[in-house]
Swiss-Prot record:
Residues bound to substrate: 9, 44-45, 221
Name of the protein in its database record: Pyridoxal kinase PdxY
PANTHER family (UniProt xref): PYRIDOXAL KINASE
The reaction(s) this protein catalyses: pyridoxal + ATP = pyridoxal 5'-phosphate + ADP + H(+)
Subunit (UniProt): Homodimer.
Pfam families to which the protein is assigned, alphabetical: Phos_pyr_kin
Disulfide links within the chain: none
GO CC field: cytosol
Keywords tagged on the record: ATP-binding, Kinase, Magnesium, Nucleotide-binding, Transferase
InterPro entries linked: PM/HMP-P_kinase-1, PyrdxlKinase, Pyridoxal_kinase_PdxY, Ribokinase-like
Entry binding sites for ATP: 111, 142, 147, 180
Record HAMAP family: PdxY
Source organism (scientific name): Burkholderia pseudomallei (strain K96243)
Name of the encoding gene: pdxY
């Protein structure tokens, strides 16, 4: 069974960061080692919260502890999400390097959280660090639209521009870019676009966009987690993308139908593993 070290935020109540990522990956048959960068009572969009960030040095100490018992060599991938400070970002880089030195076959998938995540905003300097340092280290990245623009240093309004932006990042290091939410001026307003790009291929997929009175937090974290899990299970990029598109839609639809604010991960767990409604991806002709 594959193992992934997931370095993200955590909420006790609700689903964001590791609280949105761990269970879906486990449900898909992947062991998860959660390392929580932030521990909060709930995500901050409720208006009240309690909690704090972990010290960056302790992040490395925890991973050193795994290495000390001889288990780190079994880590097949590292997934990083919210990093609250430049010190945490640097610690994540050192952790990835340690994992890869221990297991050269391990890969790193970066969800480059640069904006407000569950109401949490990273400290100044995190965005600049991610843009400057992480593409060279990552084997894959999962930006949303605004994060893609920051990584590529350009405005993006069409699929063609998004593919070109992804390819510019791929030239820096990653093998695959998953765009978790793509705004395309040519797409219908009621559709949610996702895109995945490699050096030679690109696929786009669409699912329905639901008009939530308050949009649930953690959808992006869920998206990255499912894609990583399916890739670890051996799916091709396209197959992992299509499974992710379908499974995330199922969770979002279950949440919308239940009129909930928090993602209905447990209720929709069978759909995460075996989605009943699929949305085929198609190759884009964008160069």
């Amino acid at each position: 069974m594959k193992n992934v070290l997931s370095i993200q935020s955590h909420v006790i109540y609700g689903h964001a960061g590791n609280s949105a990522a761990v269970f879906p990956m486990q449900r898909l048959g992947v062991n998860v080692w959660p390392l929580n960068t932030v521990q909060l009572s709930n995500h901050m969009q409720y208006g009240h919260w309690a909690g704090s960030a972990i010290d960056a040095a302790k992040m490395e100490q925890l991973v050193d502890g795994i290495a000390a018992i001889g288990a780190l060599k079994r880590c097949d991938a590292v997934l990083s999400g919210f990093l609250g400070s430049p010190a945490q970002a640097r610690a994540a880089v050192e952790i990835v390097r340690t994992v890869k030195a221990t297991n050269p076959n391990a890969w790193y998938f970066c969800d480059p959280a640069m904006g407000q995540t569950g109401g949490i905003r990273p400290e100044p300097g995190v965005e600049e660090f991610i843009v400057a340092e992480l593409p060279e280290l990552a084997d894959g990245m999962a930006p949303n639209h605004s994060e893609l623009q920051k990584l590529a240093g350009q405005r993006i309004e069409t699929v063609a521009e998004a593919v070109a932006a992804c390819r510019s990042i791929i030239r820096r290091g990653p093998q695959v870019i998953l765009v978790k939410h793509l705004h395309d001026r040519n797409s219908p307003a009621d559709r949610f676009n996702m895109l995945v790009v490699t050096e030679t291929e690109a696929w786009i997929g669409q699912r329905p966009l639901y008009a939530f009175p308050r949009h649930p937090v953690g959808v992006g974290d869920l998206t990255s987690a499912i894609f990583v899990a399916r890739r670890l299970r051996g799916d091709s990029v396209r197959a992992a993308f299509e499974h992710t598109l379908a499974a995330v839609h199922a969770v979002v639809k279950a949440t919308y139908d239940a009129r909930r604010y928090e993602l209905e991960l447990v209720a929709a767990q069978d759909e995460i593993a075996r989605p009943s409604e699929w949305f085929g991806a198609w190759v884009t002709g964008a160069d």
